[in-house]
Amino acid sequence: MRRLGLCSIAAAVAIAGCGPASVTPPSVSAGGASWKAMIRTMPAVATLHSTNICGDGSPACIDAVVAEMTRRFDVLNASCSHEAPFALLYLRVTEGVGIQGARRFRNRDYLNHLDAVFANLYFTAYDNWRAGRTKLVPEAWRIAFQAADQGTVSVLGDILLGMNAHISRDLPFALARAGLREPNGQSAEGDFNRVNGLLGSVTADSLAEEATRYDPTLGTVLQAARLYPVDVQQLLAGWRSNSWNDAERLLAARTPTQRAAVARSIEAGATGRARLIEAVTSNLVTGPDAAVRNAYCERRLRKSTARS
């Protein structure tokens, strides 16, 4: 990476906020009926003989993942939830897998199945948090969700906290569950790494959309921090590479005790990174405070509704 960028955010724009403000969390039901039905019968590892749309990694699997993501994002967006920025970027990346998959990946079956396994970890963490089952929520996600609910970090912070929890914490376990080989037996690492190129193709437009929807100062903060879309893409790519290595460590563990030790190290790494992100993207450092941000989002939604 040309520069880490993240550590320079603290010196970007010293805008004093008015203190944290609680954000009323939206109610998102625990998965749409079609999603829950599919997940119940989806095998852990993709197989060419599965009759489940994600079990065999068919293109319909990505459609199902995107549909559930969209259903959830629409609820978050309509309430100006601070969880919406992460959900939006995640949705745009997953849409890219479906749109660009045919030309970008050698074998989409594995990635389609992995995307379903991966997404369900986020859905489950969010649903447990909203239901008050906080002990079932990984610590990195607890930090992200609490920061969003209390309105203590910037839009960039909400994005990075979500991406860290999902990539640094969830992805190793999703990879270990799905396996590191395609249904035909070949290593899936090549296509896994090609996702990094997809990230590069959607990051700039996605960050611009985040600014339009949630905080027009996002671009200014990124420029002042010398954190450009390519840096965000490279940061996420680095986390993804670490996650593949962590999945290999999980699968190489010979005993439950060894696996538990690897799992603890994954959790600790994601949690430590979350605390760093939370500190350097505090809206007391980068602004604006939650009240200003919420007012902007609500005005935009009212204008959008009036036009329609």
Regions of interest found by a model, annotated:
Residues 19-21:
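Bacterial signal peptide processing site
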Residues 25-42, 225-308:
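A cross-kingdom marker for long, charged
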Residues 64, 68-110:
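Extended amphipathic alpha-helical scaffold segments
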